[in-house]
Amino acid sequence: SGMKRPMHILEIGTFTGYSALCLAKGLGPNGKLHTIENRKEDADKAARYFAQSHNAHKIELHIGDAKEIIPTLPYKWDIVFIDADKTGYIEYYEMVVPLLATGGIIIADNVLFHGEVLEENISGKNAMAVHAFNEHVKNDPRTSQVLLTIRDGMLLIQKNEL
C-alpha cells in the first residue's frame, strides 16, 4: 500500500489483523483502513494487536457480516483486500468493483488455494469457489488482472477506465 499512499482501504476478513497492520503502514497521512471480521473472537484478538500499533487511530474494525457492512461505508476505495470466506469472493467482488476509486485495486488472497484450483478435477467447496472466482474475474470486461503465483496466490485486479 505504500506505493499508492491510499486514503481509503477496505479489508474483508481481518483474522488476527496482520494484513491490516501491514496495509495501514502505507496509508496516506489522513488515510483510514476499514477491516471487517465476522468472528468475534478473531476480531477481539485483532483489536488487541491494533491497540499496540502506532497506526491504531487509522484502523476501524467492524464486527459482523461484510455483505451487510460494506453498503454502510460511504467511500471510494483505493485498495480492497479480500481474504475472507472463499465462497463469498464473487459476491464481495461484485459489491466492491463499483466502489473502487479511479486507479483503485482489489487484491484477492489465496487464489491458488493450496494448488487445488490447478488440478484437473477440483474437489472441495472452497477450491471450487476460488476457481469460480478466478474465472469470473478473468471474464469480467470491467477489470484487468495479474496473478501473482507467490505463496498461495494473489490476484491483483484493477478497474478499467471507461
Model-derived features with residue positions:
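S-adenosylmethionine/decaboxylated-SAM
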Residues: S1-L162
